[in-house]
Amino acid sequence: MKNSINTSEIVNIIREKVEAFDNPIKKENIGEVISVTDGIALVYGLEKAKFGEKVFFTSGVEGIVLDLDHDTAGIVVLGNDRDVKEGDTVKCSGDVMQVPVGHELLGRVVNALGHSIDNSGEIRSKNRMDMESKAPGIIDRKSVHEPLQTGIKIIDLLIPIGRGQRELVIGDRQIGKTTIALDTIVNQKKINDEVDENQKVYCVYVAIGQKISTVAKVVNKLKESGALEYTTVVVASASDCAPMQFLAPYAGCTIGEFFRDNGMHCLVVYDDLSKHAVAYRQMSLLLRRPPGREAYPGDIFYVHSRLLERAAKMSDEKGRGSLTALPIIETQAGDVSAYVPTNVISITDGQIFLESELFHKGFRPAVNIGLSVSRVGSAAQLKSVKKVAGSIKLSLAQYRELEDFAKFGSDLDASVQLSLNKGKYLVELLKQKQHLPMPVEEQVVLMYIFSNLYDQLSRIQISDINKFKYDLINYFHTTYPEVLKKLSDSMSDDIKDDIFNIVSNFVAQFNGV
């Protein structure tokens, strides 16, 4: 008997196999590298790519889409562009750039992508946040009302900074801009040791376009002072590509936002945004965007404003956290009217202007009081500081004016001579060595003596003032620590009497009377 083929059975078997087959079609948005030049890859395809989207090259190198044309995309390569070749495949990730955040990053040195570069192992953080995020709205914010103590007398007294403020540090190279930022970070050590967890100030130091040797010195200084334990250092050195230098401040800001959004306080230092602007200019010119003033692209203002607007003091409903920004700008020959300096001055809530002439005269920190201002920080000053700081700025400004006037003639009346003499004492009191931040109560003592006990102060030789102020503070700590403790908040009449008696006795001892 001949075997007959049952076609219906075969059809049913094939149908069952087809219906049971489960291999979903996977669509990927891919493109092909046309050319690579100086860290910029021109890619054909990527029809559905989004601006700012993260992409992967065949070699595993990451990139960011920063330019979109009809059929091509301009991608900045985050790494060595030698690993990217013409004809390589590029895949879209569907995500924007993210960095790890959290307490796990404290005490660590990372690059602009959040990868560890301190040979201390991987960053084991489960939390990640988008590098680019929207700044808090008006309703989510609260006015600045809590002080951020820098430990630098001339700043805490005359140009106070509040938590949530953006205060620019501007000046020529090598006159102490980074020192001010570092001393502010170091000064938080004593404060953090005495307060609750939610009142501590965590710090992020972002080094942009600096020499690796310079960054190593900064990290060592933070280690020596014990400040690295509450600080994260984000590094995009001069040897890193322009895209990494461009991303570094946004990565540092995101790390700080974690603390802000969780009801804590954070200080972010951007050192410096001049080099950040240069890196962005380089990228924009390579992407063939039209240049504007000083060859910067038209959106350079937005690049900095969207970064600095993320610094804020949050409302009670949003956890009361804060993110304070200390951007640094380097000027050329003191020219604050250049494009990038004027941009950042208009974005921030004030500026601390450092002057080369004052620095070379030996007045350090070399802060020019006439050009420096804090627009919102005075609301955050402690009561005791407000009481003694009121007349200090005027006295210093008058002294600077009279100092120039006195050069033209020797015949000065008694009142002018008194103002000049008082100014000399004030300048000596305000001088401060680097990396020696001074607690607010010690600052109050010295300024109270100048404002109210000048007769006592004038008995000291001007050349001995530096020794006198440090010896006096040590005398307070060893003999009257309770008076200093009370001064950290307010100043009553009883405390004023105590200070008068203590200073009178000490001046007599100091002069050997």
From Swiss-Prot:
TM segment ranges: none
UniProt GO cellular component terms: plasma membrane; proton-transporting ATP synthase complex
Residues with site note (Required for activity): 372
Alphabetical list of Pfam families matching this protein: ATP-synt_ab, ATP-synt_ab_C, ATP-synt_ab_N
Keywords linked to the UniProt accession: ATP synthesis, ATP-binding, Cell membrane, CF(1), Hydrogen ion transport, Ion transport, Membrane, Nucleotide-binding, Translocase, Transport
SUBUNIT field: F-type ATPases have 2 components, CF(1) - the catalytic core - and CF(0) - the membrane proton channel. CF(1) has five subunits: alpha(3), beta(3), gamma(1), delta(1), epsilon(1). CF(0) has three main subunits: a(1), b(2) and c(9-12). The alpha and beta chains form an alternating ring which encloses part of the gamma chain. CF(1) is attached to CF(0) by a central stalk formed by the gamma and epsilon chains, while a peripheral stalk is formed by the delta and b chains.
Annotated positions binding ATP: 171-178
Originating species: Wolbachia sp. subsp. Brugia malayi (strain TRS)
Entries under NCBIfam families matching the protein: atpA, PRK13343.1
Protein name: ATP synthase subunit alpha
Entry-linked Gene3D superfamilies: 2.40.30.20, ATP synthase alpha/beta chain, C-terminal domain, P-loop containing nucleotide triphosphate hydrolases
InterPro entries: ATP_synth_asu-like_sf, ATP_synth_asu_C, ATP_synth_asu_C_sf, ATP_synth_F1_a_nt-bd_dom, ATP_synth_F1_asu, ATPase_a/bsu_AS, ATPase_F1/V1/A1_a/bsu_N, ATPase_F1/V1/A1_a/bsu_N_sf
Reaction it catalyzes: ATP + H2O + 4 H(+)(in) = ADP + phosphate + 5 H(+)(out)
